[in-house]
Amino acid sequence: MALRGVRVLELAGLAPGPFCGMILADFGAEVVLVDRLGSVNHPSHLARGKRSLALDLKRSPGAAVLRRMCARADVLLEPFRCGVMEKLQLGPETLRQDNPKLIYARLSGFGQSGIFSKVAGHDINYVALSGVLSKIGRSGENPYPPLNLLADFGGGGLMCTLGILLALFERTRSGLGQVIDANMVEGTAYLSTFLWKTQAMGLWAQPRGQNLLDGGAPFYTTYKTADGEFMAVGAIEPQFYTLLLKGLGLESEELPSQMSIEDWPEMKKKFADVFARKTKAEWCQIFDGTDACVTPVLTLEEALHHQHNRERGSFITDEEQHACPRPAPQLSRTPAVPSAKRDPSVGEHTVEVLKDYGFSQEEIHQLHSDRIIESNKLKANL
């Protein structure tokens, strides 16, 4: 796999950090999840392909263990607020002194500087501060968060993964690691570059929910069907819009011009009335295989079984028959081979990991006696 041999230490956190670590593991990296003592499980359920080490970082011997491991690692991924790692004497200056090749990835909400750098937040707060949340929502309604995907996973976990890969690539030239300041506010803002760049064109000149690409246009929104389901319409280009009208049984002559913004509300009512006359399945029979840019709004379960997704193998199942998306993108020579095993229990690989990182049997036994580590396999390995 593409990242075979890359050693990653991921400090336990929520959502974006685990997602970043999972991507790296899916593509072949050796990811060790450094869990807190006493943890019961992994709340983000994104520990696929990782090994778990339970370690008390709040005590100096535990911090010393991590420091020693970082001397042999390629990447450290930490998800804490600004300053936390420095308090533990595990800041980048300290760890990179031992290992100049170490890539120190810092994934936070607000970044390592600025007035918000040490305050708490969640996805909705990061999307709000990026400016993007102001653009999401229906006309006349409050802005609403797009699940917790945009900041946590797009602007956070995925952008941090990109930073790590860039740093790994650059290291092949310089032989040196570097510090990555990945944060969800700036990551989300970067994802919205198109929005910023097209403001001068007037693409977002109307109030929220009344523009071309935010549900304001009658040909770029969703419609309810006769059976209470929904269809998604994205017929922007004139040739696609013509096919949309054909499928709906409408003539362009009986409607205002496609780009007549002032007529969009009435056109939406007209389209809604037509869509409400047939079921989702009936509309699929009409539009599937056409260039009208009309698709069904699928539930997760429906997406799993949709013919297109099944033909491509877009979803996989683990040994417990739980389904999830296959890693993307697909690489032709070195594709991802995600683990089909269950997520590790906390501390399941503590002894194994420490041995791999050069700790002796006696050292491991002492760490356990001092309650610096936990392992549910300790007795079997000592």
From Swiss-Prot:
pH-related activity note: Optimum pH is 6-7.
Pathway connected to this protein: Lipid metabolism; bile acid biosynthesis; Lipid metabolism; fatty acid metabolism
Places the protein is found: Peroxisome; Mitochondrion
Residues annotated as the enzyme's active site: H122 (proton acceptor), D152 (proton donor)
EC number: 5.1.99.4
Catalytic activity: a (2S)-2-methylacyl-CoA = a (2R)-2-methylacyl-CoA; (25R)-3alpha,7alpha,12alpha-trihydroxy-5beta-cholestan-26-oyl-CoA = (25S)-3alpha,7alpha,12alpha-trihydroxy-5beta-cholestan-26-oyl-CoA; (2R,6)-dimethylheptanoyl-CoA = (2S,6)-dimethylheptanoyl-CoA
Quaternary structure, from the entry: Monomer.
Official protein name in the record: Alpha-methylacyl-CoA racemase
Biological source species: Rattus norvegicus (Rat)
Lineage: Eukaryota, Metazoa, Chordata, Craniata, Vertebrata
